[in-house]
Amino acid sequence: MTYTKDALKEAIQQKLRLNYGCTEKQATDGEIMKACALALRDIMAVRSVDTQERTQEQQEKRVHYMSLEFLMGRSLMKNAYNLGILPQLTQAVEELGFSAPDIFDMEPDAGLGNGGLGRLAACYLDSMTTLDIPATGYSICYELGIFKQKIVDGQQVELPDDWLNLGDAWLMPKPQEAEEIHFGGRVRTRWDNGHLMVVHEDYTRVLAIPCDMLVAGYNTDHVNTLRLWDAKSPKPIDMQLFSQGQYLKANEERAMADSISTILYPEDNHYEGKSLRLKQQYFFVSATLQSITRQHIQTYGTLKNFHEKNVIQINDTHPALVIPELMRILIDDAGLGWDEAWDITRHSVAYTNHTVLAEALESWPQRLFETLLPRIWQIMQEIARRWQQKVDNFYHDPKKTEKMAVIWDGVVHMANLCIAGGMAVNGVSALHSDILRRDVFRDACGMEPDKFRNVTNGVDHRRWISQINPGLDGLIRDCIGDGYLTHAGHLSDLDRFADDAAVLSRLEQIKGDNKQAFARWAKRQQGVTLNTDAIFNVQVKRLHEYKRQLLNVLHIISLYQQLQDDPNMDFRPQTFLFGAKAAPGYAVAKRIIRLINSLADQINSDPICRDKLQVVFLENYRVSMAEMLMPASEVSQQISTAGKEAS
């Protein structure tokens, strides 16, 4: 179906009247933005139903991509672009009396991620949808995202990121599909005719309410879903305590449940923080698996063929509890024996590793599992015992047994759990995968070499070239056509233009225009004036010592000293742009941010450096900022410690 400008305009007007009780003459920019989102959501909802019916009829294998992060950025322009109606939507908004760029800029970045882990998940979801693969992403509906970064006196201050205020237009709550999650309590077991009967009692219940975000594929009617779980207590407020004036205590259980889906990565340098993180992970995993298995049983009537019709890809170790949770469902709920359940599990789950840093490989204290997840702990113990026996029989080496253990000395090792219970382990670049085989997981690879493979990180090039850089997109189309939009390999055809003076001149003009556009954005958003005649030298990524922002700072200090020693030296002007968030509890990273801002104050106020050297820290780096910055960048600093970066 073709959606014209007039049809979209009428749809937006209808949404304003029905949802916000106003006309375009009375509407705010925010209401127009949400009305546009709702109009597009309706288009995608129709296609989503068709996609689900087609998948159900053809009984296709489904991909379930589980990640604590999905760094989606903004969805309005992206979905309009993929649906092929961005020009029509732009015209419709303009004819309603609004500035389309201002309306698009109203949309907040979805607060569902932080770094490369989440951006990879978002790119995969876009790609799978474009390829017509039946896929669903799963995560948590974080109320306040990770945090909004504010720089005050050169230092990072964390503020709540209330993205749902405007971003909730994309979400479709489905309370009728809620799942119940159990924490704490105690477990009783008994044998009955050769079957283990498990009773979990005295637990705390939390409801997981699904909120679905639809994802449109490019140039296809296929629509996939990102299912986000919102945590709520099933217990009403304690009216007796409330009437006694004990307002906080009356709401205590509701507040504890709500905290599970409040923020991404709560600080975990104390017991309560660790407990909340583990609750988040199990809440997310249990809700997802209950939903997947329920849908599978409705279709096939059994879980015995679960692995034939489903694959669960876990993005890093945060969803690793999918392994014991699937075992719990297969054994306790479906009544399967251990061996059959383990065979199904091991052929259903695949694990993507994202780090080679030993200290970053996730682990948990045993006592947390015993307290919060008693039944999962029982299953984990049996997984660990059987895996350890397998390693012992293969290596006969106590040191290797300890290194590969799922549980050792009161600590649960999640990466080892993923290796033990998964059918595949992949790195995200050839070098990274090689390091995993030769070093990080060398012993596991020696025992099960076929399990380890490489899947090099990709990027949604339609977003990062065509959508955000229309000048470059136009040049590419003029040179090689638009086939690259669905077949990125066609970009290699540009090699033949490497020495084409006309193409290079046009490329230089496009870069200059993008730099000017970013400079205007930076002036408007952050009040900083950039020297667009200088090289834009950019380092934007999570703030971490191994990312070596500090090394970049030392290089800048060296350049500054050279200019001080010889102000008239031959010097190519450079503007160094930093963008990074530091984890709230990461003191060293925060001090590096302060150092960058102090250095910026010193250099930018020194007359010697005028029009030669500039340093700018970009506050609250996010996907929508990257969409402005990437087309303007000329040098991208990728200087992580050798052998420590996954990709």
Specify the residue positions occupied by each region the protein language model found.
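A conserved ligand/cofactor-binding region detector
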Residues: M1-S647
